[in-house]
């Protein structure tokens, strides 16, 4: 009997431990669409688990050994540790236990793939690639790290031959993904608790790109010095570069902003040789969101679209219709002329980029509210956090969202406030709770101002509740 070389059609129920996670849920949804029976557990129910249940998954609230039931295989994320009752029960029974990235890799082997990696911008870039391939008629399967507004989900199963996936570098598992086209947006020190050193992280990204087949393509942002250095080390594979710099194959030019909308042209410099030396230009492009970083992300998607044969007009129209992704500069409301934004940014590079985008989107003042995510991140990047809020007129820092970590001396909310002031910020303060945030906004915000809530923890709920809180008290 020949051994199976791809995911078998019959596995028995597939059990996900932590099915409500953004990465796990996308894989579960695609598996269900392919006809597999899916079940899973999470500590508590959520919109994500409710959606999966509506689609046909069996959902257990809480994690207990008996939840495994008749499962034939168990999928776990890196958040699931030894001692978890469901993991221990699966191993007691001798069931296959599969890491999330391993199951994603099995799905990817059924298709040709675009995998998007980078310290920042993965989710937005994944959404942009999906948007362009949709517009090009490719009908891609998509597994993303955020909810795509056009889908109402972080995943969809398409009938086409291409799959678009977000490749997470946080635990090194992205090197297991069999990418046909590999995108790298940027490389900054992050997730050092896994990598140990920046050199190890650099090596991880090089391995990710080097894994593409000989007929594949590496798509790299040469505006970022670490990525440009990576390009210099790549051999024997095709590379397309993108960015604002004059050497990029796909280059944004003539960029300006009007009412928070980016207007620009795209010079396809890498196609000059195919065009008798003339550089083709996609003129009159618009992207309905501010931020140079978002324009850069769009260039990565354009590089993929051109590689797959999409026409300039198709690309221009698709960019103009881009619907965005949840928690990436998401406008959650406006009260008395004050706009409230919810954003996932929690690394200093991301925070600086988001606040620059806020400046481009408003003529008023920018009020930043940040909840640091993990003591370890705040500690290791403390000086960067003290200087990344320069574009904000007012900075309010909430209590650190620990994500299960123990406090680290010198890396608290009050330490960061003191650090901001010491580094010259004119108006930095602590914010104690939602009520304090409401008082701050009433005290500081005027019509035309923008309140930007930043972080990967519970700050999103504060942002989404703020318009109603302000409206109720005003009534």
UniProtKB/Swiss-Prot annotation:
UniProt entry keywords in alphabetical sequence: ATP-binding, Cell cycle, Cell division, Cell shape, Cell wall biogenesis/degradation, Cytoplasm, Ligase, Nucleotide-binding, Peptidoglycan synthesis
GO terms assigned for molecular function: ATP binding; UDP-N-acetylmuramate-L-alanine ligase activity
UniProt-listed Enzyme Commission number(s): 6.3.2.8
Domain of life: Bacteria
Subcellular localization(s) per the UniProt record: Cytoplasm
Top EC class for this record: ligase
Family the UniProt entry places it in: Belongs to the MurCDEF family.
General function of this protein: Cell wall formation.
Protein name: UDP-N-acetylmuramate--L-alanine ligase
Gene that encodes it: murC
């Amino acid at each position: 009997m020949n051994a199976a070389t791809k995911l078998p059609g019959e596995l028995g129920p597939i059990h996900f431990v932590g099915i409500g996670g953004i990465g796990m849920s996308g894989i579960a949804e695609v598996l269900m669409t392919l006809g597999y029976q899916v079940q899973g557990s999470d500590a508590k129910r959520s919109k994500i688990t409710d959606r999966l249940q509506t689609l046909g998954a069996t959902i257990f609230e809480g994690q207990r050994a008996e939840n495994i039931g008749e499962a034939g295989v168990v999928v776990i994320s890196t958040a699931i540790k030894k001692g978890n009752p469901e993991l221990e029960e699966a191993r007691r029974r001798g069931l296959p236990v599969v890491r999330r990235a391993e199951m994603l890799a099995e799905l990817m082997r059924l298709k040709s793939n675009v995998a998007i990696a980078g310290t920042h911008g993965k989710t937005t870039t994944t959404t942009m690639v999906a948007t362009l391939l949709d517009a090009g008629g490719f009908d891609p399967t998509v597994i993303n790290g955020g909810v795509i507004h056009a889908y109402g989900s972080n995943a969809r199963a398409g009938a086409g031959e291409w799959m678009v996936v977000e490749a997470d570098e946080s635990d090194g598992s992205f090197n297991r993904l069999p990418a046909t086209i590999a995108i790298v947006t940027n490389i900054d020190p992050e997730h050092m608790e896994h990598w140990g050193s920046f050199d190890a992280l650099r090596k991880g990204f090089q391995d990710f790109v080097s894994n593409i087949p000989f007929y594949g393509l590496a798509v790299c942002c040469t505006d970022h010095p670490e990525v440009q250095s990576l390009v210099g080390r790549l051999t024997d594979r095709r590379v397309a570069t993108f960015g604002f710099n004059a050497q990029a194959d796909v280059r944004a030019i003539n960029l300006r902003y009007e009412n928070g909308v980016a207007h620009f042209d795209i010079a396809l410099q890498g196609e000059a040789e195919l065009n008798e030396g003339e550089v083709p230009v996609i003129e009159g492009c618009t992207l309905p969101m501010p931020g140079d970083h978002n324009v850069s992300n769009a260039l990565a998607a354009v590089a993929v679209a051109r590689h797959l044969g999409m026409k300039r007009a198709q690309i221009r129209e698709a960019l103009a219709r881009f619907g965005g992704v949840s928690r990436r500069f998401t406008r959650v409301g406006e009260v008395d002329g004050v706009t409230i934004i919810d954003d996932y940014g929690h690394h200093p590079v991301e925070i600086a980029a988001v606040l620059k985008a806020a400046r481009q989107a408003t003529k008023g003042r920018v009020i930043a509210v940040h909840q640091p995510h993990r003591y370890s991140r705040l500690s290791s990047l403390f000086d960067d956090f003290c200087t990344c809020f320069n574009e904000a007129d007012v900075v309010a820092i909430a209590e650190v969202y620990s994500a299960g970590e123990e406090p680290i001396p010198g890396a608290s909310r009050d330490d960061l406030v003191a650090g901001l002031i010491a580094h010259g910020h004119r108006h930095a303060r602590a914010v104690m709770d939602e009520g304090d945030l409401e008082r701050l906004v009433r005290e500081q915000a005027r019509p035309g101002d923008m309140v930007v809530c930043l972080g990967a923890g519970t700050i999103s709920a504060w942002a989404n509740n703020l318009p109603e809180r302000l409206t109720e008290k005003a009534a």
